[in-house]
Amino acid sequence: MNRKILYIYPWKAAFIDKDLDFLSRRYSVVTLGHDWRDKRRTLPNFLKQFIFLCRNMAGTRAILVMFGGYWSFLPALAGKFTGVPVYIIPGGTDCVSFPSLNYGSLRKPVMRTFIRWSYQLCTKLLPVDESLVLSDYTYLPDADHPKQGFRYFFPGLLTPHRVIHNGFDPAFFTADPAGKKENSFIAVAHAQEMQRVRIKGIDLVILLAKRFTHCTFPLVGVSDSLNRELSPLPSNLSVYPWMSKEKFIGHLAESRFVLQLSVSEGFPNALCEAMLCHCIPVGSAVGAIPSIIADTGFVIASPEWEYLEKRFEEILHTGAEEQHRLGIMARNRVADMYHISRREKAFLEILDEIPG
């Protein structure tokens, strides 16, 4: 059996490391570590990727590509010519378009074309949630599109798909439920510029902190430069930059609730990690968030302030016993439904099915 796999990604992230970890236990995984976020590097990256593929296609069992984009086109094309199976993993922004918010890869005509070509050429799509395939969008009242998902934007796409959710390790993300601070709401948003403030719901977190002054709101993942732009902030809102997972768990261990008020999400990792630490989820009705939360927390149907304020008051009136129960349920749901072993099993099934 051929044991070599190519794994392509546009930038390195912790959730990619998890994939590489379990794949490397069974296969020899070869990666190409280019960062495609700098537009000035697009053409040089294409050249480097072409050379990489020429050198590594021989003897390759399969190619995995995280997200659709410029970086997924050449691997998909190479797979089509050589017969090597190519699996693209749509993760969020590569399935949505919000022109009014300057968000979503599919709002850009050229990027959208490369994504469409990639999705057409590849063997199978492995989205992290069904909402990225096709879903109604009702969260924003003035949304650009009534639906989101790659089958909405590419209605003629014939490539099959299989949903494989992100996976998490309950043994690593764990905390004592007795160590929670009352009325504490942690929010996590990897944000370096003002555009992300609206996308990730940071604007709503700030409003909530101003209104509910007896609550505390740790906000993790905001760059120092953006923090300065947002200042002054309410005294009960503490801003932290991106941090190690160990420090992050320390903050999760103290927080009673976790806020995920994004206007668009794929399958939010931080939400699940917080739930494993017994944080009660409070999340917007977008992407995978409602199905992740289910009956373990609170789904926010709209960002409209009157509704949000009333909903938040209801959340604060939840009794201590009920809060404890919800925290336990939140951890159990992620541990049962989204265990890393499930993702590993699904990927290995697909790779083991390949002839040869």
Question: What is the meaning of each model-derived region?
Answer:
Residues 96-98, 286-299:
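Short acidic/histidine- and often glycine-rich active-site loop of Leloir-type glycosyltransferases
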Residues 165, 169, 177-212:
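Conserved donor-binding/catalytic core segment of Leloir-type glycosyltransferases
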Residues 227-249:
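Nucleotide-activated donor-binding/catalytic signature segment of Leloir-type glycosyltransferases, i.e.
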Residues 263:
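Aromatic "clamp/platform" in nucleotide-sugar-dependent glycosyltransferases that forms part
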Residues 298-306, 314-320:
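Conserved acidic donor-binding segment of nucleotide-sugar-dependent glycosyltransferases
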